[in-house]
Amino acid sequence: MAAVPDTSDMMTYCSGNENDLFFEEDGPKQMKGSFQDLDLSSMGDGGIQLQFSHHLYNKTFKHAMSIIVAVEKLKKIPVPCSQAFQDDDLRSLFSVIFEEEPIICDNWDEGYVCDAAMHSVNCRLRDIYHKSLVLSGACELQAVHLNGENTNQQVVFCMSFVQGEEETDKIPVALGLKEKNLYLSCGMKDGKPTLQLETVDPNTYPKRKMEKRFVFNKMEIKGNVEFESAMYPNWYISTSQAEKSPVFLGNTRGGRDITDFIMEITSA
């Protein structure tokens, strides 16, 4: 069995410049060839110069070990790149490593939904005939003409921008009465969609994801606004031509029912 050379023998054999390893039939000799002779780029001080011999017989274990050391050093030599590493190269690498898969959410527990910061504005609404909306009794809105000293009866809405179905020209909002636990909502009564004021828990409302009965799609038309029920499409917050009539949910646009409102943003 061949004896394994001692580490010190190997270090002695590779003494001097450890990168200068030459291989011939009889062992290390003077340099007769290099990578520079092969018209390769200069590798600086870390270059390894080799002399290749076609005589493969009579090689010792030391020769084999030296070749292994040389090959391992060659692996560590940086290869010049014709251009800098680009973002596209990184994307190509990621596409090989990772496989893109769609994320499908069939349903989720609303108890774990974290509401984003609510955006809301205070506003007053009048129909295009300048009737203001006032609170009559405990839970009814009426449209009346106000002037002078009674203008302070006009209701101030806190209009919150909420989550709704994706629409390009419709903005989902909820309309609550400022400083009151009342919100406009839609329900069914005697087989017909109706508008009502609903009392809510102030510790829970408003919230980003409101129940659909509270949601209205706000649309701007020629400087005015319309509010369409999200629960009952094509039904709108409406007023009547008559004075002191209740505000209701109607499905007639451009007729006797008034669906266009003037919105005034206020800080009050």
From Swiss-Prot:
It is found in: Cytoplasm, Cytosol; Secreted; Lysosome; Secreted, Extracellular exosome. InterPro entries: IL-1_CS, IL-1_fam, IL-1_propep, IL1/FGF. GO terms for biological process: cellular response to lipopolysaccharide; cytokine-mediated signaling pathway; fever generation; immune response; inflammatory response; positive regulation of canonical NF-kappaB signal transduction; positive regulation of cell division; positive regulation of immature T cell proliferation in thymus. Keywords: Cytokine, Cytoplasm, Inflammatory response, Lysosome, Mitogen, Pyrogen, Secreted. One of its GO terms (molecular function) is integrin binding. GO terms for cellular component: cytosol; extracellular space; lysosome. Residues 1-115 form a propeptide. The keyword Secreted applies. The record marks K170, K178, K180, K189 as: Important for interaction with integrin. The keyword Transcription does not apply. IL1B production occurs in 2 steps, each being controlled by different stimuli. First, inflammatory signals, such as LPS, stimulate the synthesis and promote the accumulation of cytosolic stores of pro-IL1B (priming). Then additional signals are required for inflammasome assembly, leading to CASP1 activation, pro-IL1B processing and eventually secretion of the active cytokine. IL1B processing and secretion are temporarily associated. Potent pro-inflammatory cytokine. Initially discovered as the major endogenous pyrogen, induces prostaglandin synthesis, neutrophil influx and activation, T-cell activation and cytokine production, B-cell activation and antibody production, and fibroblast proliferation and collagen production. Promotes Th17 differentiation of T-cells. Synergizes with IL12/interleukin-12 to induce IFNG synthesis from T-helper 1 (Th1) cells. Plays a role in angiogenesis by inducing VEGF production synergistically with TNF and IL6. PANTHER family: INTERLEUKIN-1 BETA, INTERLEUKIN-1 FAMILY MEMBER. Monomer. In its precursor form, weakly interacts with full-length MEFV; the mature cytokine does not interact at all. Interacts with integrins ITGAV:ITGBV and ITGA5:ITGB1; integrin-binding is required for IL1B signaling. Interacts with cargo receptor TMED10; the interaction is direct and is required for the secretion of IL1B mature form. Interacts with HSP90AB1; the interaction facilitates cargo translocation into the ERGIC. Interacts with HSP90B1; the interaction facilitates cargo translocation into the ERGIC. Belongs to the IL-1 family. This is Interleukin-1 beta. It comes from Equus caballus (Horse).
